[in-house]
Amino acid sequence: MSLKLAAIFKDFMVVQRNRPITVFGTGVPKTVVTVSLHTSFSKTVVAADGTWCATLPPLAAGTDYVLTVSDGTTEEQRKQVAVGEVWLAGGQSNMELALRDSADGVAVSKAYTGTQIRFYQVPKRAVLDETHQQLEAQSAWKIAAAENVGDLSAVAFYFAKRLAQKMDCVIGIVDCYWGGTSIACWMSESMMQSVAAGQKQLAAYKAEVGTKTAEQYAAEMREYEADYQKWQANIDACRAENPNVTWKELHERCGECPWPQPTGWQSPFCPTTLHRTMMQRVAPYTLRGVL
């Protein structure tokens, strides 16, 4: 295992100003890791489990910095780092709604000329597998521009745009959401087990899933996706026929949307799953707050 930064640490990233900056990753146990960013410096030792976490002293707002991490054998750098305000956009579909899909979102995206917003989208995956590793490797901090800002959460975009107008610094948004999920999906198992309601929900889900294998879950999901696509095709046909059709009329003609999805340990709707595969992958990245 060689020295490695967590996936969220990429070129063009934004780190929180005026607060201690947490930098973390993996490496060879017992090796010393040094971390520097602009005028801040820190060192730490890789733990027995191969993880490390260092804390840099606070920095004022600024841009064009280089983050350097080294264990004496391997060195990694991240360039074009900005120090500004960082917010995590979390939740379900109301936060997940992309700017391009919101009211006037396409026009707003095309007209956007700002340079002060950057965003990182945590890979949406409910299993820590090879695909998850590939998605994290491909993930990137992006400088919001007309050609990509439509991908950003609409809520987060308007929040960041207003914040950028009020503050003379770069605004960083960490997108971490999944439509239709409950808070239980984003909580650790230990936290769920610490309260009666959490214990009850975990027990109920385990009883429902039982000994279902990954293969069985995959087969159920294929059947579910086929049903959903058939329903969506009927909805699209009705809307093409009558653009002003109401949801009541759609439901009468096409039936209710197939929901919920099948249960399974690989499901994003399984309690604690997204805590492991999404939230924990970016914690403890230093933030100003959470939307």
Identify the function of each model-found stretch.
Residues 1-291:
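Cell-envelope and extracellular/periplasmic
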